[in-house]
Design a protein with these regions (language model features):
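Mixed-charge, low-complexity segments
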Residues: 1-180, 196-331
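Surface-exposed charge patches
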Residues: 192
Length: 331
């Protein structure tokens, strides 16, 4: 059973001591059938006055830290080791109610799935709906797997992965119009396309493991990653990564699930200080396979090297994902 260790370090810097408000930290991987957390640690400097753990409305693990000390830096380091048993491509049988689309959700499940079925963004001209419907067979019911797999691989082939300097997740129609975006943009685009078909879908945030022994052509490594979960009767929640064309959880480490990307921000908080006190942030993320002696020996060194690299690349996607969530209160 593969063991993976995730190192995630974030450092916020200020040009003078500032006070810190409450911070919500969502970095601990989720326990599940295919993923078991063996160990998890969280180091924060300056030391919090209090640190408590809760589960949010989606069952994600969230640490809430409060502070009574001023400092010029705020550092958060998470290290977790997980036993990862990836679920391969799912298989529906002809007897399953969701084998063909359209299908109907069970009336007992439907009320709980409504929040994941209702589109979140407008589609005034029907462009997003039209894009989604190109994966349907014109002459009858469509195998559901063909729709989901078609979208996953279609986005990867037709769209261009592009790191953006703007904060947040772009509108799905912008992703469609430009044919480009980040992993978060791709995930939200596919989620909305599925919702316009009446299929329940939600956002997943986590990490991507890139094996060193083969060339997968993955993008999105070295930072937090985003993909999609789809709910099907008889199958439950199933993973799809349109950025890398992955069906199932191979090389995907799940941290949080949410209806909206803003509910799955890794680190969210505020500081109280002058408007010009904030200097910038640095992020280093490293996912390694436990048991590879050479990799294990290099993991800490690689993390530090990556952190230094992100100092020079302050506007990259992972920096956006966390800096947007640090709501700076300026006085």
């Amino acid at each position: 059973m593969p063991l993976l260790t995730i190192h995630h370090k974030t450092v916020y810097r200020y040009n003078r001591p500032v006070a810190f408000g409450e911070h919500r930290i969502m970095l601990r991987p989720r326990d599940s059938h295919d993923q078991r957390v063996l160990s998890s640690s969280l180091e924060i400097s300056p030391q919090p006055m209090s640190l408590r753990w809760i589960h949010d409305v989606f069952g994600n693990s969230v640490a809430i830290a409060t502070f009574d000390e001023r400092a010029e830096t705020l550092s958060v380091t998470s290290v977790a080791t997980v036993e990862h048993n990836p679920a391969e491509e799912f298989a529906l049988t002809a007897d399953d109610t969701a084998y063909f689309y359209p299908f109907v959700y069970d009336r007992e499940e439907f009320p709980d799935l409504q929040q994941f079925i209702a589109p979140q963004y407008g589609d005034p001209n029907g462009d997003l709906s039209a894009w989604a419907r190109q994966f349907l067979d014109a002459d009858g019911p469509t195998p559901t797997f063909n729709i989901l797999s078609g979208m996953t691989h279609g986005i990867r082939k037709a769209f261009t992965y592009r790191k953006r300097h703007e904060h947040g997740t772009q509108h799905p129609l912008d992703t469609l119009q430009t044919g480009s975006g980040t992993c978060r943009d791709y995930a939200m685009f596919m989620i909305e396309a599925l919702r316009w078909l009446g299929i329940a879908a939600r956002f997943v945030s986590g990490y991507l493991f890139i094996p060193g022994d083969s060339a997968h052509g993955y993008v999105g490594g070295g930072s937090t990653h985003a993909w999609v979960q789809v709910y099907l009767p008889s199958a439950g929640w199933i993973e799809f990564d349109p950025t890398n064309g992955i069906v199932g959880t191979r090389d995907l480490i799940r941290v949080a699930v949410a209806r909206d990307p803003r509910q799955a921000i890794p680190l969210h908080g505020c500081y109280l200080g002058s408007a010009d006190a904030y200097v910038g942030m640095e992020i280093g993320i490293n996912v390694v396979s436990v048991g590879d002696e050479e990799t294990d020996a290099r993991s800490d060194e690689a993390l530090e090297e990556q952190l230094e690299e992100h100092v020079r690349e302050a506007s990259e996607e992972e920096s956006q994902a966390q800096s947007q969530s640090q709501s700076h209160e300026r006085v």
